[in-house]
Amino acid sequence: MKHFFVVAREDKKEILEFVQKLTDYIEKRGGTCAYGINPDDALEAELDLPEDTQGILVAGGDGTVIRAAQNIFGKNIPMIGINRGHLGYLCDLDDASVYDAIDAMMAGDYSIEERMMLSGHMVDAQGNAGKEIQALNDIVLCSSAGLQVMHVVVYVNGQYLYAYN
């Protein structure tokens, strides 16, 4: 793996400085590293990935990883999170491990762990289905009309599971 694409929040100076160091590190070892858009501003946008992208590095916290996963859904490119936030339970790397991991990836010494994505869509009272969404971790349901009863029907892999009022 030699060609990387970095997704990071553009509003945090320390993250941008880290991304520059990461880019320099990769390029000094013969790789390429393009920079991505802020996933917070681009939930509906497609990432414009270079054709030779072999791996996506997400620098941020869990929220950045979740939004990046939505943006790259269906692209079949490995993604790894680098914790630049607080908890980082979705991030596999941190400051102490990132450069060794980059070296290993560039040497072809890595394995890919498949993660399940959730999908869902809303159906209005007239039976019209809304846009399908993908999610890495969870889907939260809330009424846009305030305190209102919601009718929820849950299917798993196309099989009815339960209904809730």
Feature-to-residue mapping (PLM):
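ATP/NTP phosphate-donor binding region
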Residues: M1-G55, A59, A96-S111, M122-I133
